[in-house]
Amino acid sequence: SKSTFADRSYVILATPNHGRVNALAERLEAQGIEMYTNTAPLKVASATTQLGAQEKGVVIPKGSLIIPNRQPDAPLIAAIMEFDANVRESVLVEERQRVLRDGSSLMYDTTAWNFSMMYGLPAVTVPQHLDKGLKPWQPATPVIDVKPDAIAWTVDGDDDRSVAFAARLMERDIQVRVIDKATVLSGQSLSRGSVFVTAMDNPHTDNLPMLIAAEAENLTLSVKSIDSGFGAGDLPDWGGAHFRLLSRPQIAILSQAGFSSYDVGSTWWAIDTHLGIRHSQLDAAYLSRADLRRYSTIVIPNGYRPLGGSELEALRGWVRQGGTLIAHDNSAANLAREGGIGSVRTIGDALDDAQDYDIALQRELLATSEELDMAAVGTHRLNPAIAYPWDQGSSPLSAEELKRRDTWQSRFMPSGAMVAGRVDPLHWMSFGTGNMLPLLYSEQPAFMTKDRQQSIVRVGIHEPDPTAEQAETINWSTTPRGKALRVRMSGLLWPEAASRIANSAYVTRERIGKGQVILFSGQPNFRGSTRGVGRVWLNALIYGPGLGTSPKIDL
């Protein structure tokens, strides 16, 4: 009770993503770590958030996963659960000296590693030993309610296993839909991203309820039966545009020479483990001569060489005909260049048009604002004093200065730090994610988007800051008045690197012809541990052919 670990508890806040919490609990249990849950909301005097903020009077919701640090493996628990481990000043001084002298580093591995951020689960650290009103933690018991006479059956889209459920049913040639807006049917709440299977879509499928129940049992996933398709009030009804039909993905991974065996392996593992469906591997050496028509989705893992002209031309034509191309890390950077595929660019290639990218960023931010001057909207007199996003009082930097800064700041890129990602809450690729997503960031490309290119995840979370009386210029972007930007969550992230990647895009999507190109700045399945951003990747892989491309009609 007198150790440095005695008065500390780690809390994974209650979430409907039972599959992900169960996966974390299994790993903790394998180490003999004791876990508990609260049977009622629990108020604590203070807690530290994953963004490092100290909050007072925090209420821990019922059903949270609580891990007291006061138990036999206390040092291990702290090592794998604490949000932000300190690095000695002497180490930081030597690290910075090395970076500036010759670009070398003391850091041989990622400097940020804790379970809650890797798994993308919201959590807090409570500076006290929690033991009252708790009981041993048990995984949620699935309720498989499959009525044979129901008109439809659904699983919760907040749970990662819902993606596997959809993928496996489509492997059986069952028609599957996904809901892109939350609704209530038959008194049952259906979240965004919920998988929806109807009897009407599958009139010739024998034993449909039995197949649904069997797959749910395999995944230990709850299923709800729906008896009425009328949404409560103005909520979506079955038959409306929000119940979107999926297409069965036919997946290939580029591999062999020129690709990272780590990323190829973790991509392969993610498909096998999280989805359990078939896929193919294509030798990149034969890409320009391969028949790509059999695939609807191609994944390009992190690679060490850019694709050649004939290879790019083959992929470009395939995308235009309706393919979904997903690329990681350096492979994504090789596509995001002049002569690549699409119009997304890396920061270094976009600074000549910095103001255009900043205006696109401001439009995104304004699109989420709920502030409105009703008097200005309702006036009959023309008001010439219109506020424009490029006229906030801050002075933009010249292209020359931006390039000079980018060259300098790129020296300080991390070896593996956690940064805060803000998520587009309306995009189909963000099913099952919150508004903030921890991102593992290293020496990797930072992307820029504008016009019709979409940023599903950007770096940095805006928070209210009453002291920020003026807009602030951060390299190419502008932070609005009254806002502050939080970037670092955990690990070593030099201020120069934080400024460089602030507001850049981590996940992008661009429509090209009938198909789409989806770029991930990093490796979304890093060592099989980044479950948060991994969910975005699973959405792209399984839902992309149905939600992001034009349907193919075979006559």
Which residue ranges define each predicted feature?
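Intrinsic-disorder/low-complexity accessory segments
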Residues: 1-555
